[in-house]
Amino acid sequence: MIRAEIIFRYAEKDILKIGRIISTLLFKTPNMFKGLEKYLRDEVPFIFTDNFLGCYLGIMQNPDEIDLFCLEIVDVLSKGSDIDLTERILYYIKDCPEIELIKVEQ
């Protein structure tokens, strides 16, 4: 299973803005995240990318601490050995001044 999870704070507390920032950092285009109108996770703000190679990226906003977010890779195929891509994603977002990294799951 491919996985990655990065917990961070974003002072502006806007899931769409942080989605555009992360989309630009990872994909060089600001509009890869979508889906806020369809909450997939127990009525918490959640945006996601299209499925690519059996995975998608998701950003979830904590409903209690609205400046707290989680960026994760969701493997929809869930086959094979564990592959952790946390370090690779951190490489692209760690120097972004708008993001304060909180916790990295590995």
What is each residue range found by the language model?
Residues 12-19, 55-56, 76-87:
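Short, surface-exposed beta-strand/loop "edge" segments at domain boundaries and coil↔beta transitions
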Residues 10, 39, 56, 91-92:
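Sequence-level detector for tyrosine residue identity
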